[in-house]
């Protein structure tokens, strides 16, 4: 056991000792580089989300275990749970009929008793989640505001609550999940946070939390409405879209912390990937690889620099960027690109750099970002469509 732990620490040291959390009154918490970084350096990788949900009209297209597009890799032939949908054999949970898999192996990893008892895997379709989804209706939780985002967010919260309900049954993996979520920032009842949200948004969260609590109470899991309100606030601050490509978002997710080790392989800090702040001129890029999320450096980064990613399409105009960030993420962007005079030399240089690392794949007019992965120093790769461009371009 000691050898395994040491191996894990060494892996984490390689990937994570290069960053740390800093905090200021103006910016709040952010991630800062502890070392000089090269172009294309892997900064952090989180293997799987704490909770997630797919858009309801796409649940039969993506594997609940590996997030693969199940319509592309249907290869299950002898599973009693497979069903014929549009002449494609797909494995699913036959109780709620809302959880699908690409293979027998993925089915077993999520649905088997052995997986539930496994000490590490938290990607489990619990009996409680199955019951809730079988009796769940979007209009019940969000009767007035019922957008696709709301529906997916509700199901993501259900996914999380359905797992921590088992944290009292001597199940350490779900207790750790609870601890990780508690470390994320929501602050729904914080006065400053509620000044950011409109009265309608606050009312919507309160109504959804009340209705969701009532639904769980029907199955004897009693949870305080305030806890659910905080989960919705955390979702607004910490959730990531699940993207098939630059135009197709298929779900929503929240990722927990990664442990950082110092040079002596001692625990140094816990860092959440959600602490990467937004910039319209980012120095890092987010890459989704099935369940995992990786952050790579887009440009050389100096020690002490804040690390940032873009939450939006960086090709948008300044006015569109500001409006989108205000409406969706509830903040006014004050990054260098948004505050510089538009015709200044530095502003023009930034726009030239942005143009250089945006995807050039004209066949689908992709809005992704080209990055240089550590395993390939010859070609840059788009973080969305995976289009490749020779580095000498």
Swiss-Prot record:
One of its GO terms (cellular component) is nucleus. GO terms for molecular function: methyltransferase activity. InterPro entries: H3K4_H4K5_MeTrfase, SET_dom, SET_dom_sf. The keyword Methyltransferase applies. GO terms for biological process: methylation. Keywords: Methyltransferase, S-adenosyl-L-methionine, Transferase. It holds the Pfam family SET. Residues 17-312 form the SET domain. Belongs to the class V-like SAM-binding methyltransferase superfamily. Probable methyltransferase. This is SET domain-containing protein DDB_G0283443. It comes from Dictyostelium discoideum (Social amoeba).
């Amino acid at each position: 056991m000691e050898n395994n732990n040491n191996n894990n620490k060494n892996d984490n040291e390689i990937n994570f000792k290069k960053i740390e959390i800093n905090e200021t009154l103006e910016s709040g918490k952010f991630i800062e580089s502890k070392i000089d970084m090269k172009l294309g350096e892997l900064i952090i990788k989180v293997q799987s989300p704490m909770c997630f949900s797919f858009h309801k009209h796409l649940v039969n297209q993506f594997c609940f275990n590996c997030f693969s597009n199940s319509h592309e890799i249907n290869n299950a032939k002898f599973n009693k749970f497979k069903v014929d949908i549009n002449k494609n054999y797909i494995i699913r949970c036959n109780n709620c009929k809302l959880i699908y898999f690409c293979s027998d192996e993925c089915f077993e990893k999520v649905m088997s008793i052995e997986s539930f008892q496994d000490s590490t895997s938290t990607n489990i379709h619990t009996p409680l989640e199955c019951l809730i989804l079988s009796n769940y209706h979007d209009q019940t939780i969000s009767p007035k505001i019922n957008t696709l985002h709301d529906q997916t967010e509700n199901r993501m919260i259900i996914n999380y609550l359905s797992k921590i309900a088992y944290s009292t049954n001597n199940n350490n993996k779900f207790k750790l999940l609870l601890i990780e979520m508690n470390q994320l920032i929501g602050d729904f009842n914080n006065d400053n946070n509620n000044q950011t949200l409109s009265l309608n948004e606050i009312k919507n969260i309160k109504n959804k939390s009340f209705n969701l609590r009532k639904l769980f109470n029907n199955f004897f899991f009693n949870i305080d409405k305030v806890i659910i309100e905080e989960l919705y606030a955390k979702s607004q601050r910490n959730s990531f879209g699940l993207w098939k490509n630059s135009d197709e978002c298929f779900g929503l997710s929240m990722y927990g912390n990664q442990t950082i080790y110092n040079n002596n392989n001692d625990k140094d800090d816990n860092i959440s990937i959600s602490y990467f702040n937004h910039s319209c001129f980012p120095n890092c890029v987010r890459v989704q690889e099935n369940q995992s999320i990786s952050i790579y450096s887009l440009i050389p980064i100096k020690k002490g620099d804040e690390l940032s990613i873009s939450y939006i399409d960086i090709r948008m105009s300044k006015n569109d960027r500001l409006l989108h960030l205000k409406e969706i993420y509830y903040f006014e962007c004050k990054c260098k690109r948004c505050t510089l005079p538009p015709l200044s030399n530095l502003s023009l240089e930034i726009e030239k750099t942005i143009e250089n690392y945006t995807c050039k794949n004209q066949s689908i007019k992709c809005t992704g970002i080209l990055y240089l992965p550590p395993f390939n120093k010859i070609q840059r790769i788009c973080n969305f469509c995976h289009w490749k461009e020779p580095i000498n371009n």
